Regions:
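Conserved alpha/beta-hydrolase "acid-adjacent" motif
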Residues: 208-216, 225
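Flexible "cap/lid" loop of the alpha/beta hydrolase fold
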Residues: 104-112, 116-158
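Short beta-strand/loop motif that positions the catalytic acidic residue
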Residues: 195, 201-203
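Active-site loop/oxyanion-hole signature of alpha/beta-hydrolase fold enzymes
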Residues: 56-97
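Acidic catalytic loop of the alpha/beta-hydrolase fold
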Residues: 206-210, 248-249
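Active-site nucleophile elbow and catalytic-triad environment of alpha/beta-hydrolase enzymes
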Residues: 175-191
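Catalytic histidine-centered segment of alpha/beta-hydrolase-like enzymes
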Residues: 241-255
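Conserved HGGG/HGGXW glycine-rich cap/lid loop of the alpha/beta-hydrolase fold
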Residues: 15-67
Length: 266
């Protein structure tokens, strides 16, 4: 895996958001990690995608290099932060990819700042809270440092986080803030139906979101409404992929993922 060509901090909605950049040319591709994630989660993928375009990975507030401000995490402010990085770096219109929690943040960015997003890729992210399986929503309801920190402190994820976090004591507050975010109700169905840019939805066949919810999301984007015609002329602009043999937690390692994203955003 290569080191980033550039890195820095972008002032965005009151947060100094950490970013890393690889490659040059083409439409920039912006990557947003999942919960408790880091830019390094995308290292292998960024190497693959940056051979002929610029790829920028960011860390949301309270994650990795990016300090928390102490305010509650909210989807809308995460969307503001992503837009702030895009604007600060002068990227113009980008292709935006978000995974899990980063998918929700990326969807909010596309809803709030549609002019900044040429194409949107969402991996393992639903359009409404009730689309998660009931047991996942129950886990969100109980998510907090008291219940999770002892489990996570011995994980490779925590070890990676400790190497880059500016405050080594800030992981428990991150768990609490993330749990609070994931307990908030949301349903963006109406806004999703109004999106003009093409959207690629990618899920695992053993995801934390049932296939029926993925199909519902796709339907809001104009997908699954009719036959595409023998020549594909009635194919919707948006796409849906369900990858076999994968779960919510290992999707970024799916061998098919790089080419699926390249084909959609190329």
């Amino acid at each position: 895996m290569s080191r980033p060509d550039e890195s820095g901090y972008a002032p965005a909605d009151g947060v100094e958001v950490y970013w890393e950049s690889r490659g040059a040319g083409g439409t920039p591709l912006v990557l947003v990690h999942g919960g408790y994630g880091l830019t390094s989660d995308f290292d292998s993928l960024a190497d693959s995608w940056s051979t002929d375009r610029r790829v920028i990975a960011i860390e949301l507030e309270g994650h990795g290099h990016t300090r928390a401000t102490g305010r509650p995490f909210r989807w809308e402010t995460f969307g503001d932060s992503i837009a702030g990085v895009i604007t600060h770096l002068g990227l113009g219109q980008v292709d935006l990819l978000g995974y899990s929690l980063g998918g929700g943040a990326s969807l909010r960015c596309a809803i709030q700042y549609p002019g900044l997003v040429r194409r949107l890729v969402l991996i393992c992210a639903p359009h409404r809270r009730e689309a998660w399986f009931p047991e996942i929503r129950a886990a969100f309801d109980g998510m907090g440092a008291d219940s999770l920190f002892d489990q996570l402190r011995h994980s490779p994820m925590f070890a990676a986080w400790q190497k880059v976090a500016p405050d080594p004591e800030s992981f428990p507050p991150l768990i609490d803030a993330t749990g609070d975010l994931l307990r908030q109700p949301y349903d963006w169905s109406a806004q999703v139906a109004g999106l003009a840019m093409p959207v690629m939805l990618i899920y695992a066949d053993a995801d934390s979101i049932p296939p029926a919810a993925a199909a519902e999301f796709f339907g809001l984007l104009g997908g699954g409404q009719r036959d595409a015609n023998w020549d594909g002329s009635l194919r919707p602009a948006s796409r849906l992929a369900v990858l076999p043999g994968r779960t919510h937690y290992d999707m970024l390692a799916a061998p098919a993922l790089p080419e699926i994203v390249t084909a959609f955003t190329g």
